[in-house]
Amino acid sequence: MWTLVVNCGSSSLKFALLNPATGETPLTGLAERLGSDLAAVRVDRGEERGTVPLPQGSYSEAFGVLLAELDALGLRQEVRAVGHRVVHGGDRFNAPVRITPEVLEVIRTCIPLAPLHNPANLAGIEAALAAFPELPQVAVFDTAFHQSMPPVAYRYAVPTVWYTCYGVRRYGFHGISHAYVAEEAARLLARDLTDLSLVTAHLGNGCSVTAVQGGRSLDTSMGLTPLEGLVMGTRSGDVDPGLPDYLAREAGLTLAEITAALNRESGLLGLSGLTNDMRELEAAAAGGNTNAQLALEIFVYRLAKTIAGMATVLGRLDALVFTGGIGENSATVRAATLARLGLLGFQLDAAANAQAVRGQGGVITSGGVPALVVNTNEERMIARETARAVKGAPA
């Protein structure tokens, strides 16, 4: 069964045609700058690549290109379902669901929780429904994996009315990635996922750590929004909640300006004053740039502290999993993090760690608790979850 996976951003549309069982992917594409005169879609057909301009710059136009590509490959009639990444499902969804008018309405009610993402997700779903009206379509939520967290993990110590009336609680994100790498780690370790206690670290421009026990999320570092938790590429992570009030009084900044700075001008970029790219930071740090060195030290310090905290949540730790652009490719960050986590029993294999880059995963420890590098594949996880939802739901 071929499954079409769709991931819509505020000005982009990413798609992939996958076999959920094998991971075979004969077609991928990325439409960017939607809504502008420069909109175009890059298409990858394996050995062939091309770019198609989108004069209207719309989601529906991008889907038109997708349909033409499927026809060219002779696979349009072979697509059995469409899976959509949806960033926020609030507390209404703890698993992927077949898309219905009722599901669409719930996604709309979650727009205040994800004002940049959910509207784009809805636009993509509506375009896909128009392009593939005969196919089952499934919403796979980034927040659903974390709905297994207990109240002790997801409630904030704020007035209860904020929770009951406004949904103020911790939701967590990167759930699709955390779920995928947990499954893959169990496979690599030849262990039953239901018997494993894992800490998974998704480290990219956005970063989060999750405690996974028996395949279920017990706690995670992101919260109501993706701003909470670790130091990230341009996001601050945890700061004193009194910071906005202080900056409003002392610097005359508005709430919108402070929020924008915490999301787009902070993290590794803010600390270093150079870049949010870990590769460039590592090079600058190696060249003696003290700001870059400090940014790396703070990133690793906060990461190690959070991993140790998640291990405490689990009660025992069977393995630590690194994934995401930084987690999969920065041997420096992995080594520095494990060096701070000696009390958990990690014994780094320096050679294996150095080799685990550019798509080469595997175990990077020589003894004690295993640490692994697992290449995330959110598209394949969405395809898997879509196939499960279609198989398990009535037509």
From Swiss-Prot:
Keywords, comma-separated and alphabetical: ATP-binding, Cytoplasm, Kinase, Magnesium, Metal-binding, Nucleotide-binding, Transferase
Site (Transition state stabilizer) residue list: H174, R235
Catalytic activities: acetate + ATP = acetyl phosphate + ADP
Recorded metabolic or biological pathway in which this protein acts: Metabolic intermediate biosynthesis; acetyl-CoA biosynthesis; acetyl-CoA from acetate: step 1/2
Cofactor binding note of this UniProt entry: Mg(2+). Can also accept Mn(2+).
Residues of the active site: D142 (proton donor/acceptor)
Major location category of this protein: cytoplasm
Molecular functions per Gene Ontology: acetate kinase activity; ATP binding; magnesium ion binding
Keyword Transferase: yes
Signal peptide residues on this chain, from the entry's feature table: none
Pfam families assigned to the protein according to its UniProt record, in alphabetical order: Acetate_kinase
Its EC number(s): 2.7.2.1
Binding site for Mg(2+): N7, E378
Cofactor(s) for this UniProt protein: Mg(2+); Mn(2+)
Residues reported in the UniProt entry to bind ATP: K14, H202, L203, G204, N205, G206, D277, M278, R279, G325, I326, G327, E328, N329
Location(s) in or outside the cell: Cytoplasm
CDD domains according to UniProt: ASKHA_NBD_AcK_PK
Assembly: Homodimer.
NCBIfam families tied to this protein: ackA
Summary of the function given for this chain in its UniProt record: Catalyzes the formation of acetyl phosphate from acetate and ATP. Can also catalyze the reverse reaction.
Stated name of the protein: Acetate kinase
Organism: Deinococcus geothermalis (strain DSM 11300 / CIP 105573 / AG-3a)
